[in-house]
Amino acid sequence: MDAESVEPFLVYLPIPQRVVVLVLLGLWLWTWFLKVSVSYYDVSKVIVSNESTGLPYFNTSTKIHQSSLKLFKSISRVIIPWQLVCIILFQYSFTNNVSNKLLWFFLNVSPLLELFYIFAMILRSSAMVARCFKRILWVADIEPKPYRNNYIIISDTLTSYSKPLVDLAIYATFLFHDPTNVKCQVERYENAISLNIDVLVGVLPSLVRMIQSLREFTRGRSQKKDGSQLFNAFKYAGNIPIMLVTVYTRYYNLGPLGMMYWFMFWNSAYSFWWDVTMDWKLELFDFVNGDTSVNNNNSSNKADGLLRSILLYRKNAWYYSAMALDFILRFVWFWEYISGHSVFYGELNIFWLQILEIIRRWIWLFFKVEVEYIATTEGGKMDE
């Protein structure tokens, strides 16, 4: 294969290897989230862990952070050198047209083995995480509190990784078809796309969250709770029309692209409103609920009608910045559409957008977990 016909970025970071990078990024951001959050509240009241402190002067929240940091370091010590060796070998072999099939088999299968190692380490490190993953992937289950937040964090994180999962699925299809092919890591396998494997994999995380929301709606109705989870299910269902239009356009030269953009706009707008109003319980766009468990007393924050009465992170600017960033990142596709330009070109731009979505999810996590902590410690009823 001619190296000049491939984007330079793919030679430096092949598609499956960048999925590995994104997983490492997510683990690092999770560890950073814990480091920051434990300074403000006890995360262990929201996130259930099977860890025991072992030391009386360490609270459980600190122990969770230390365990996560230890896990991240253990994974990084193996994966980063492994990945660097594979990338250097790939660059040399690809640019010099090396045709050794055994070498290419090793290079092509390595990203899959790296990911297998990462997730094996994660699941082995925590029986609780393994339990949640098993129930999520098997029947899209979600247990009630105190385990509910574990399921939400994992499942919503998977939705932010939907596009990297698509890349992984296309690469894996190519790998199983021809594991010694030079193009396996730099080309999107046409057979996988023609079979719409990318669409099916891309919509799965949203389907899981939709089913979980419907389960909670059914559970809540029997307990005479509000029906907010039904509207949460609508949010995740918003991805389905986009996927259907994508499939349609593949079989017809002229598809309803205008309709797809309208679906995308509605989905981004509704998801942004849900993040701010329902997940973070901020009042800026709260046109539905006049009162919640985190907005049930008089304070300067509540009086301005923009935030809420209890703010654990203290500085109002952090909340306004989070709302602004969430809005920008939810609509990043729209800015590219109306401008006709992207920040980068081709696969590098795709990688950039995937990084931004993971960062958006990281920002979301701070305020979602904060709200759940307030609801738990204040003892008030909170809309789930």
From Swiss-Prot:
GO terms for cellular component: endoplasmic reticulum membrane. The chain crosses the membrane at residues 19-36, 78-94, 102-123. The keyword DNA damage does not apply. Keywords: Endoplasmic reticulum, Membrane, Protein transport, Transmembrane, Transmembrane helix, Transport. PROSITE patterns: EXS. It is a multi-pass membrane protein. InterPro entries: EXS_C. Its main location: endoplasmic reticulum. Belongs to the ERD1 family. Required for the retention of luminal endoplasmic reticulum proteins, affects glycoprotein processing in the Golgi apparatus. This is Protein ERD1. It comes from Kluyveromyces lactis (strain ATCC 8585 / CBS 2359 / DSM 70799 / NBRC 1267 / NRRL Y-1140 / WM37) (Yeast). The gene is ERD1.
